[in-house]
């Protein structure tokens, strides 16, 4: 059994920055300005002129939050570079490329438009450590050190941010790579990649059909994108496309659709890209980093290729930490977060998509034959809500868990973890016998309900 504890309680930062419903709780202009002031003070070190890169997705509230962040950063003496709508990995890239002290992405990823979030990146383009976020939290609740009028920062928009990122995307595949033979449906979720992803794929030669490229401030992730696949599945089949590419609101995750309209998740994509990298002696670390939620089938497949699967707790930040400490250059999540460290410092759905398209072209085979690299082991996840207490500490629940492990008899996996944001226990089991998997999950869920 793999069981996670709850994260250390923090007032502002969660597992992926600060996130919430706009104009409530921590997601207000006032809090955004204080975050900017605290982060600006923290990163305002050295004698050089300090700067921050700010990008956003297409949410209506993005303009409001951007203005608050600009006010906060400039008030503590930092210059601001505004990119406009741009994917999260592009903001991370430009932060490093433009020698900025800090990068900020305004996005709530795959959440509906009512939510928004603030993600921070250090000068190296990587997300901040827990220690740095805690230091910034302390600054948020302290009095800001406002600078004299003559030292207030300046703000400017750069017009070529999209072009810079498109160039970097094309550099992530070989110079000989062309997609002339492919007809590709690209779904950008009416989000941050609505201009850059179709352009990059088209510039590499593909015929493209676009979905989710008409953002209006309120339609991000609404019936389109990697969490709403009906439209792209239907379009791929109706248009006779070779493949579909579905991104989420900030384009840090990817789900692929084969020519038959079947979805291909992050586990299959990781398996495909990792084996192609291994064939070219480009894979580092001897395998792939994924979370405890990745399918056992991926682990068995990699093992058959003499590669290993290193597991972490859920969250792409934990995947990235293990990649950095273990020398890996590919990792991700079943949900579609894909980190290719040779080309990006955070999850980048478009970079991963280009790798998938290159593999498809080089194979000369249909996507349905190329993308489904392993047989999935039956897997079931259920969420159980509870009221008060700690149900996982109850003897009755521990007995149910022990019975489940005994029933699986080493031929499956059991993952039980509390949610870090709500009173929910997540129960996942997988094994070769689908009926047995369902039985053990239901038994544990019943025990949690009774204990709660």
Swiss-Prot record:
Modification Phosphoserine occurs at: 109
EC number: 5.4.2.10
Catalytic activity: alpha-D-glucosamine 1-phosphate = D-glucosamine 6-phosphate
Residue positions of the active site: 109 (phosphoserine intermediate)
PTM note: Activated by phosphorylation.
Annotated Mg(2+) binding sites: 109, 248, 250, 252
SUPFAM superfamilies cross-referenced by the UniProt entry: Phosphoglucomutase, C-terminal domain, Phosphoglucomutase, first 3 domains
InterPro entries registered for this protein in UniProt: A-D-PHexomutase_a/b/a-I, A-D-PHexomutase_a/b/a-I/II/III, A-D-PHexomutase_a/b/a-II, A-D-PHexomutase_a/b/a-III, A-D-PHexomutase_C, A-D-PHexomutase_C_sf, A-D-PHexomutase_CS, Alpha-D-phosphohexomutase_SF
One example GO MF annotation: phosphoglucosamine mutase activity
GO CC list: cytosol
PANTHER family: PHOSPHOGLUCOMUTASE (ALPHA-D-GLUCOSE-1,6-BISPHOSPHATE-DEPENDENT), PHOSPHOHEXOSE MUTASE
Family (UniProt): Belongs to the phosphohexose mutase family.
Alphabetical list of NCBIfam families matching this protein: glmM, PRK10887.1
Function: Catalyzes the conversion of glucosamine-6-phosphate to glucosamine-1-phosphate.
Protein name: Phosphoglucosamine mutase
Recorded name of the encoding gene: glmM
């Amino acid at each position: 059994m793999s069981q996670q504890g709850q994260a250390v309680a923090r007032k502002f930062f969660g597992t992926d920055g600060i996130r919430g419903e706009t104009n409530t709780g921590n997601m207000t202009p006032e809090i955004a300005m204080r975050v900017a002031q605290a982060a600006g003070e923290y990163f305002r070190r050295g004698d050089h002129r300090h700067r921050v890169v700010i990008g956003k997705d297409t949410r209506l509230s993005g303009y409001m939050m951007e203005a608050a962040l600009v006010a906060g950063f400039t008030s503590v003496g930092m210059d601001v570079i505004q990119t406009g709508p741009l994917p999260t990995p592009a903001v991370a890239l430009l932060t490093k490329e433009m020698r900025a002290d800090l990068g900020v992405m305004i996005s709530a990823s795959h959440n509906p438009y009512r939510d928004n979030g603030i993600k921070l990146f250090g000068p190296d383009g990587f997300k901040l450590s827990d220690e740095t976020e805690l230091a910034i939290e302390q600054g948020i609740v302290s009095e800001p050190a406002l600078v004299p009028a003559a030292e207030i920062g300046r703000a400017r928009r750069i017009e070529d941010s999209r072009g810079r990122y498109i160039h970097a995307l094309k550099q992530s595949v070989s110079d000989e790579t062309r997609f002339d033979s492919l007809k590709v449906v690209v779904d950008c979720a009416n989000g941050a990649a609505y201009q850059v992803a179709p352009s990059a794929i088209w510039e590499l030669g593909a015929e493209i059909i676009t979905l989710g490229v008409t953002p209006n401030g309120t339609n991000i992730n609404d019936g389109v994108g990697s969490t709403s696949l009906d439209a792209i599945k239907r379009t791929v089949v109706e248009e006779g496309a070779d493949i579909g590419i579905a991104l989420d609101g900030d384009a840090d995750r990817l789900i692929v659709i084969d020519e038959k309209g079947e979805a291909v998740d992050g586990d299959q994509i990781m398996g495909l890209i990792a084996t192609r990298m291994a064939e070219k002696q480009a894979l580092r670390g001897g395998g792939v980093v994924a979370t405890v939620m990745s399918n056992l089938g991926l682990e068995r497949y990699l093992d058959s290729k003499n590669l290993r699967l290193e597991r972490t707790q859920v969250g792409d930040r934990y995947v990235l930490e293990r990649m950095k400490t273990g020398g890996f250059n590919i990792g991700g999540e079943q949900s579609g977060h894909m980190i290719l460290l040779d080309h990006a410092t955070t999850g980048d759905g478009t970079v991963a998509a280009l790798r998938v398209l290159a593999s498809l072209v080089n194979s000369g085979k249909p996507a349905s034959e190329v993308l489904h690299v392993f047989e999935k082991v039956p897997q079931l996840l259920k969420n159980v809500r509870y009221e008060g207490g700690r149900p996982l500490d109850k003897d009755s629940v521990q007995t149910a868990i022990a019975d489940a492990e005994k029933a699986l008899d080493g031929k499956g996996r059991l993952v039980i973890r509390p949610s870090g944001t709500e009173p929910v226990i997540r129960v996942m089991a997988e094994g070769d016998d689908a009926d047995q998997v369902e039985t053990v999950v239901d038994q544990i869920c019943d025990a949690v309900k009774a204990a709660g």
